Amino acid sequence: LAKGQSLGLVGESGSGKSTTGMAILKLLASQGAIRFAGQDLQALKRREMLPYRSKMQVVFQDPYSALNPRMSVAQVIGEGLRVHSQLNDDEIDHAICAVMQEVGLDVDTRHRYPNEFSGGQRQRIAIARALVLKPEFILLDEPTSSLDRTVQAQVLDLLKDLQQKYQLTYLFISHDLAVIRALCHHTIVMKAGEIVEHGETQSLFENPSHPYTQQLVRLSLL
């Protein structure tokens, strides 16, 4: 996965997409090698892994369960900074306000709680939480699947703008081929835990070679 690009990971439910993503972040134990900027993360001990945690972030599928309802938005977004940075309280608050503006949220709402926001706004909060640490890589695990089409398009546009501005690298997990086509440079197709096809996104979906990929493309056109 090249810096500044997006890799799509598609397949039906249960194909192993999210498991693969969690393994890459070392949130699940796995075998084999996971290389980030040339470093095999599997060889690192827990303490050695800590500097990489801020460089590798995740935005989950469900914005309703991904945010702690007992924490204010400022606490949610700033939590990582308190672990991974040496900033004081004023500097953290400034960083929170800056990233909220970046994702299109009103900074005056930062002391409110997640249940006071819509689904689309909550997903922007989740994106801000990841972005505030200035990561290089973000795992996006079906981040728009629970949103309606209009809000989904807005969030996808935001992700594309942020990628271009900060040269972010995305692994985008989805079952929605339209979303993958809109965002991803290359795509991997998974079935039953195995990669069955991969390639440049446009050519892969225009000329799929594996029967399973052909099936996914047909279903997406219905």
Stretches with model-predicted labels:
Residues 32-40:
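Conserved ABC transporter NBD signature motif
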Residues 41-57, 75, 83, 203-208:
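ABC ATPase NBD coupling module
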Residues 90-108, 217-218:
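Conserved ABC ATPase "signature" region
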Residues 113-117, 121:
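Conserved ABC ATPase signature
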Residues 132-136:
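A short, proline-enriched helix->beta-strand linker immediately N-terminal to the Walker B motif
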Residues 198-199:
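ABC ATPase "signature
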